[in-house]
């Protein structure tokens, strides 16, 4: 079985949106979280979806799922204090529906510009290599600093990538890593970072273009422009 774990537990402090969390902001009458969920809803290889959501917005999400015909969501789980905690909450809730060798795609609810092909590549790579980390080649030079003032390293750009999502794993393995982190008192930025903390080898799946995460106000307007450009290509054959 293949499960999509969508975490949408963030409050969106950097969006300056006082009325709604960022994942519930709408574009053309449809919330960002629904745009994201639709890719997994309509993918033949995804069997079920688990969503981690802000507790106070769970009822709102349930109504949206019904309104937009999202039927694969099998449960909605309250999120934690951090993204790490939210993913762990979701993984724990899946113990009764997932086997150790099932595939789980972990994806941001505010990353709606993925594709069917990217999901397929993640599933295939995870089955072959044990995991799949969607990554994008660096477009500019990356510098490293330990104190935020002095640059101590400029790695070759050809070797640098940005971790994106989905990040895909065998369920038993990724759950074990999160449980180890809990015992050790560790927190991670994302699942790829967690794998690195415990020395796990990771396999790259090259990201599709414009796989942005909507975090700040500018991201929303970039997303809207990109979405409308893609719509124009379909309509006008540009």
Can you describe what each PLM-predicted range is?
Residues 113-205, 238:
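Conserved core of the sugar-phosphate nucleotidyltransferase
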């Amino acid at each position: 079985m293949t499960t999509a774990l969508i975490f949408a537990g963030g409050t969106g402090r950097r969006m300056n949106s006082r009325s709604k969390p960022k994942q519930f902001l709408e574009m053309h009458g449809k919330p960002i979280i629904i745009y994201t969920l639709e890719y997994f809803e309509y993918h033949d290889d995804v069997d079920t979806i688990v969503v981690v959501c802000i507790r106070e917005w769970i009822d709102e999400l349930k109504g949206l799922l019904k309104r937009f015909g999202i039927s694969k969501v099998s449960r909605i789980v309250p999120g934690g204090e951090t993204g790490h905690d939210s993913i762990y909450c979701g993984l724990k809730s899946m113990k009764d529906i997932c086997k150790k060798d099932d595939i789980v795609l972990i994806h941001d609810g505010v990353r709606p510009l993925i594709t069917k092909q990217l999901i397929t590549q993640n599933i295939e790579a995870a089955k072959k290599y044990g995991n799949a980390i969607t990554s994008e080649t660096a477009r500019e030079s990356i510098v490293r600093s330990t104190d935020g003032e002095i640059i101590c390293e400029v790695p070759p750009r050809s070797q640098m990538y940005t971790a994106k999502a989905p990040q895909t794993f065998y369920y038993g393995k990724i759950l074990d890593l999160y449980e180890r982190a809990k015992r050790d008192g560790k927190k991670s930025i994302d699942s790829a970072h967690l794998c690195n903390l415990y020395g796990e080898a990771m396999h790259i799946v090259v990201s599709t273009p414009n796989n942005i995460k909507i975090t700040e106000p500018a991201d929303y307007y970039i997303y809207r422009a990109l979405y409308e450009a893609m719509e124009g290509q379909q309509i006008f054959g540009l």
